[in-house]
A protein has these predicted regions:
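Charge-dense, helix-prone N-terminal extensions
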Residues: 1-116
């Protein structure tokens, strides 16, 4: 599910009105975060948005597909991401329905063993 960095940057610009937008590379694609909530994946010149009730109502005629074989179905946005106001509203609505991320536990340091 490779995608170019330029396409990812374009999608980030399109979503900027939704809140604090960031990305993280994973699974050969980019995960799109809005206010620290994972709302979409960017890959293969498409955007896969996490399904929510408000998102479904906003989109209307939804196209769904697997992010990867065997995954849950996601909303596939193939062209409407070019409409900045529409796309940022979809991302904002999606993030609004998702729970706050759980705080990450600090990583435990390596144990040191003393040899006698």
């Amino acid at each position: 599910m490779a995608t170019s960095e330029g396409f990812m940057e374009f999608i980030v610009e399109q979503a900027e009105g939704a809140g604090h937008i960031s990305t993280k590379r994973m699974f050969g694609a980019y995960c799109l975060y809005c206010d620290e909530k994972p709302v979409a994946f960017i890959g293969e010149n498409s955007v896969f948005v996490k399904p929510t009730e408000k998102g479904r109502a906003f989109i209307g005629d939804v196209t769904e597909g697997e992010l990867f074989p065997g995954s849950k179905l996601w909303f596939i946005i193939e062209e409407r991401f070019e409409e900045r106001d529409w796309f940022s509203e979809l991302i904002r609505l999606t993030a609004g329905e998702l729970p706050q991320p759980k705080p990450r536990k600090p990583r435990a340091g390596k144990k040191k063993y003393l040899m006698n």
